[in-house]
């Protein structure tokens, strides 16, 4: 029963209660009848088992549909389709009675449903307005089969029968234990006048008072019932009332038509053996006039189909609602994850972004790289102001499909942005800024913050990299302008850090050639002072220039900035 959500109490009786519930899985609204603890009360258990047994074998458009049966903690639970409207509700809304056409449709379906039960040798025994449900489409459904039972075999007697007094047949009131389908027909006769007039036909306060109302309208009981009355110990010392003047139905309800009075009289015949069967009632003139029975039978089928569609649409609507709620919850979870990711450590976040972007096509990476290259950052310090020009990634440069001759703007790999490495990394003989190169995969997460000092304008003889001389000159001027003192140092004392060309074999070979050239010149001439040449005068239009050719006589600096001198202790 955990799959049902309680929506409120519908009704309560001496044997249990009925609650309105919603199925959490399908969203269908149901009515659950919860009996009292049946293991402690044999009567409750008997009523529950009887209703379960009968409703399992009764399936009809005018009978309430039993959906499920379960037992939990000594209690029986019966799950029915939910119909929240009854004929009693109509009578309370219209105390002066219902319209003729409405009563005609209701009675046709009531008799049809009871006739189906009788055809299966089952009598309801508790027909009354509150036990007759009406759906939104106008389909009538009989409910509450707690007092229903199969017909007794010959010689068998009925026991434990307690029904609503106002609708009890005379044979039930006097205690006859051999009754049959006629008790339901009597109840139908009581409903006929009540639905038309809005008031109960025989509103007795007790069993003897009920007999009095019946005898006032219909006359004396049959001899057999009178005998049973005087033998019944319940009526010991009580005599049947003497009726001096009767009040028949036509006098009591003069506004009712003759056909309605005739239908009621047939159902309310004082002798149960003379009451008609339900099949005979359906052929009464009340239903056959103007072809109502045939016409309404077709209309009833459409109403039943409409109710079935409404149930199906309700299920689909609930399923769509659940799917939407599920999608909304997933969306909220995604939003939560995004918020958590933005609050995470920047390095971890960038790493995650890198993994995601790595699976995309090269065109997207190139587009993002171009957008990133349009940004610039400004590094401020006490001694220098350097404008950093972002570069594209090494991965883009290492692409062999790139024509470096036609695309001189291809960027060099990202460089470390430790400015202290600039001074020892400048070679007067090489004319290049050599900084330790880190792994591309490590620097990828910080490539947006890389600080390249040079921008390629022409590729080197190796066909891989080129240095933008103009950018280097402006950087040199900014660095040298900050220094005020000149210090002397020997060219032999200058030790350049070795580049780690793990993934650039051609540059490593080029570095060896440059070293040999520098050692040869060292033997012939020792310079006591060395200036880092300005590259402003180098012919930028000579594509065959090599790195060792950059070394030579110092070029004059247009700005007149002095070179910094450093003392090296060994």
From Swiss-Prot:
Residues 320-334 have a biased composition (Basic and acidic residues). It catalyses: L-seryl-[protein] + ATP = O-phospho-L-seryl-[protein] + ADP + H(+); L-threonyl-[protein] + ATP = O-phospho-L-threonyl-[protein] + ADP + H(+). Transmembrane segments: none annotated. It holds the Pfam family Pkinase. It comes from the Eukaryota. The active site is at 126 (proton acceptor). Keywords: ATP-binding, Cytoplasm, Kinase, Nucleotide-binding, Nucleus, Serine/threonine-protein kinase, Transferase. The keyword Transferase applies. Its EC number is 2.7.11.22. A motif ([NKR]KIAxRE) lies at residues 45-51. GO terms for cellular component: centrosome; cytoplasm; nucleoplasm. Residues 311-334, 548-570 are annotated as: Disordered. CDD domains: STKc_CDKL2_3 (cd07846). InterPro entries: CDK (IPR050108), Kinase-like_dom_sf (IPR011009), Prot_kinase_dom (IPR000719), Protein_kinase_ATP_BS (IPR017441), Ser/Thr_kinase_AS (IPR008271). Its main location: cytoplasm. Coiled coil: none annotated. Belongs to the protein kinase superfamily. CMGC Ser/Thr protein kinase family. CDC2/CDKX subfamily. The [NKR]KIAxRE motif seems to be a cyclin-binding region. PANTHER family: CELL DIVISION PROTEIN KINASE, CYCLIN-DEPENDENT KINASE-LIKE 2. This is Cyclin-dependent kinase-like 2. It comes from Macaca fascicularis.
């Amino acid at each position: 029963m955990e799959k049902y959500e309680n929506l409120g109490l519908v009704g309560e009786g001496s044997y249990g209660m009925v609650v309105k519930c919603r199925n959490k899985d399908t969203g269908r609204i149901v009515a659950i009848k919860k009996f009292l603890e049946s293991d402690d009360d044999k009567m409750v258990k008997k009523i529950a088992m009887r209703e379960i047994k009968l409703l399992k074998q009764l399936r009809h458009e005018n009978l309430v549909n039993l959906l499920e049966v379960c037992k939990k903690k000594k209690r029986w639970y019966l799950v029915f389709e939910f119909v929240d409207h009854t004929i009693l509700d109509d009578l309370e809304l219209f105390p002066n009675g219902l319209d003729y056409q409405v009563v005609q449709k209701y009675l046709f379906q009531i008799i049809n449903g009871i006739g189906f039960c009788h055809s299966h040798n089952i009598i309801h025994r508790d027909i009354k307005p509150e036990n007759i449900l009406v759906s939104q489409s106008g389909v009538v459904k009989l409910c509450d089969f707690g007092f229903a039972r199969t017909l007794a075999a010959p010689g068998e007697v009925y026991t434990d029968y307690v029904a609503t007094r106002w609708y009890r047949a005379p044979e039930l009131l006097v205690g006859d234990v051999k009754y049959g389908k006629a008790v339901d027909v009597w109840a139908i006769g009581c409903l006929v006048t009540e639905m038309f007039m809005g008031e109960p036909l025989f509103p007795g306060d007790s069993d003897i008072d009920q007999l009095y109302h019946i005898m006032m309208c219909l006359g004396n009981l049959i001899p057999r019932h009178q005998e049973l009355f005087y033998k019944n110990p319940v009526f010991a010392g009580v005599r049947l009332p003497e009726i001096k003047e009767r009040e028949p139905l036509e006098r009591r309800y003069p506004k009712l038509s003759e056909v309605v009075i005739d239908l009621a009289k047939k159902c309310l015949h004082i002798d149960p053996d003379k009451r008609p069967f339900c099949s005979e009632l359906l052929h009464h003139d009340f239903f056959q006039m103007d072809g109502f029975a045939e016409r309404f039978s077709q209309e009833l089928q459409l109403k039943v189909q409409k109710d079935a569609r409404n149930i199906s649409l309700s299920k689909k609507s609930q399923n769509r609602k659940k799917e939407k709620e599920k999608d909304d919850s997933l969306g909220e979870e995604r939003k939560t994850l995004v918020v958590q990711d933005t609050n995470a450590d920047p390095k971890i976040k960038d790493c995650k972004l890198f993994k995601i972007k790595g699976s995309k096509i090269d065109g997207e990476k190139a587009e993002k790289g171009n957008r990133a290259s349009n940004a610039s950052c400004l590094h401020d310090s006490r001694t220098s102001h350097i404008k950093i020009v972002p570069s594209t990634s090494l991965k883009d440069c290492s692409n062999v499909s790139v024509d470096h001759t036609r695309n001189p703007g291809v960027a060099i790999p990202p460089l470390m942005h430790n400015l202290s490495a600039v001074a020892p990394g400048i070679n007067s003989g090489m004319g290049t800024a050599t900084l330790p190169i880190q792994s591309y995969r490590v620097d990828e997460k910080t490539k947006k913050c890389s600080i390249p000092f040079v921008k390629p304008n022409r590729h080197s003889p190796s066909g891989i990299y080129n240095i933008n001389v103009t950018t280097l000159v402006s950087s040199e001027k900014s660095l040298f302008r900050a220094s005020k003192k000149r210090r002397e140092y020997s060219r032999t004392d200058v030790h350049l850090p070795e580049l780690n060309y793990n993934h650039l074999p051609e540059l490593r070979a080029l570095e060896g050639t440059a070293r040999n050239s520098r050692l040869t010149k060292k033997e012939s001439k020792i310079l006591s002072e060395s200036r880092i040449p300005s590259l402003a005068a180098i012919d930028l239009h000579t594509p065959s220039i090599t790195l060792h050719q950059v070394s030579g006589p110092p070029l004059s600096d247009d700005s007149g900035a002095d070179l910094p001198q450093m003392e090296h202790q060994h």
